Amino acid sequence: MLSQEFFNSFITIYRPYLKLAEPILEKHNIYYGQWLILRDIAKHQPTTLIEISHRRAIEKPTARKTLKALIENDLITVENSLEDKRQKFLTLTPKGHELYEIVCLDVQKLQQAVVAKTNISQDQMQETINVMNQIHKILLKETHND
């Protein structure tokens, strides 16, 4: 079935990609899950735990545990909302922003090196990105309609 092969093709590149990215993250003393949340905060700050768990499709306790580690490492700050004391806004600290920039550059170099070894055109990459974004939206919608 083509749809099964389609999904399996994305699953099969995930682990090898992580293996290539891990040394970059280890060099900066950050785990992949922490990196994904740090990157999410950088792109959407100020943001909240609930927004992160929704965008990343992870459980709130998992996100909370990861956020705790990022706070302890002085990579993010937490500020109470003025309107709703239960709501807390998350932003990068200067140290967190610096780490984000450095890791982004290293990861981009890795990604560019991998793409350079293929014959993938810019148009093919853009089409794949569009399709993956479409699927991501549907999957998020499906997982939040429980």
From Swiss-Prot:
Tree of life domain: Bacteria
SUPFAM superfamilies, per database record: Winged helix' DNA-binding domain (SSF46785)
Cross-referenced Pfam families: MarR
Alphabetical GO biological process terms: response to stress
UniProt keywords, alphabetically: DNA-binding, Transcription, Transcription regulation
Molecular function as annotated in GO: DNA binding; DNA-binding transcription factor activity
InterPro entries on file: HTH_MarR-typ, MarR/SlyA-like, Tscrpt_reg_MarR-type_CS, WH-like_DNA-bd_sf, WH_DNA-bd_sf
Chain ranges of the HTH marR-type domain: 1-137
Protein name: Uncharacterized HTH-type transcriptional regulator SAS2155
